[in-house]
Design a protein with these regions (language model features):
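Bacterial N-terminal signal peptides
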Residues: 4-15
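Tandem repeat scaffolds
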Residues: 19-175, 179-199, 206-207
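TPR/TPR-like alpha-solenoid helical repeat scaffolds
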Residues: 128, 203-219
Length: 219
């Protein structure tokens, strides 16, 4: 059986008889389905390159390892969808809802994305993300995730990127200092922590600053 027909059969057997199933037929037959309801659809490894999915409802859809290169996903609802390992090279995600979206290991090279749209998604390990698309807060939070997993070099790198994006965030300096301390680099850890203390003094938080200085004195 040809691969496209096999994919269509697999998808339809797993879908209820509903508008969603009709939309799956349209999508897999025509390669496009703007404004379609495709919530919870199973589209693992589907080839949807250049598909028009403008304003499609793809909530919780499983698009892991799908090919969406050049796809029009403007204003699509991708909340809590699975795009892990998907190829989204050159896709248009402007206006797309990405809250809770799993973009880990996805390729976003050349993708068009609104600034801040990735803040509530899971993008760690994604490729091709333009530097300005990740806010200082999202970089810091990703660093916290890596630190909680005990991956200190990765945590240090992400906290460093958060600092580059916003050098006035004292907590990112603290976090990078702690990450460096966990790796045995006490000299650099002390530098980061003392810089954080200086920032906190200037920002009107002397108690926090004093606590950090006391910590450094014990290193």
């Amino acid at each position: 059986m040809p691969a496209p027909l096999l994919l269509l059969l697999t998808v339809l057997l797993g879908a209820p008889l509903s508008t969603r199933a009709d939309n799956l037929i349209v999508l897999l037959d025509a390669g496009s389905c703007p404004n379609c309801t495709l919530a919870d659809a199973d589209l693992v490894c589907a080839d949807l390159s250049d598909a028009n999915l403008n304003a499609a409802d793809l909530r919780r859809a499983n698009l892991s390892r799908a090919r969406l290169d050049g796809a029009d996903l403007r204003n699509a609802d991708l909340r809590f969808s699975n795009l892990k390992g998907a190829s989204l090279r050159g896709s248009d995600l402007r206006g797309a809802w990405l809250d809770g979206t799993d973009l880990r290991q996805a390729d976003l090279s050349g993708a068009l994305i609104n600034p801040g749209a990735l803040d509530r998604s899971h993008w760690l390990g994604a490729m091709g993300i333009n530097q300005g698309l990740r806010s200082p807060a999202s970089l810091h939070n990703a660093g916290v995730d890596e630190a909680n997993a005990g991956r200190w070099p990765q945590a240090e790198r992400l906290f460093g990127e958060a600092i580059q994006a916003d050098p006035e965030q004292a907590m990112s300096w603290v976090a990078r200092g702690l990450s460096r301390g966990q790796q045995g680099d006490e000299a650099k850890a002390a530098q980061d922590l003392l810089h954080a203390a200086d920032l906190l003094d200037r920002q009107g938080a002397p108690k926090q600053s004093d606590h950090i200085r006391q910590t450094v004195a014990k290193l």
